[in-house]
Amino acid sequence: CVIVLDALAAATREKLCAVLQLTDTGLTPGSGVGNHRKEVSRRTLGVPVLALGLPTVIRAEQLVGEETPAEGEPLFVTPRDIDQRVRELSRMMAYGIDLALQPHLTVEDITGLLG
């Protein structure tokens, strides 16, 4: 099994840095922001893929309710404190993955491993 993590584009402001998407169908990096990359899935790798995604960006027009001009590139924004949020959320994800894969470890053990 391969575990992949990716940043996602949020559909709503409320989901920005607030939800975690978990799927066994893999992912296509960049697809939420129009920058499609090669799919990472069971079909492409030949093994099960568990994908975790965290919405860290949102289209500006979703915040203001307007469409961007057709000739312009879409504008994506992040919260002002995105660096801190990503540090905290990635740590939370690391704890979850470690506890799921190594159930014999305690939270204290994992804290020692993560530093």
Model-derived features with residue positions:
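C-terminal functional extensions of proteins
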Residues: 45-115
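Glycine-rich phosphate-binding loop
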Residues: 1-39
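Short amphipathic alpha-helices and their capping/turn segments at secondary-structure boundaries
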Residues: 39-41, 45
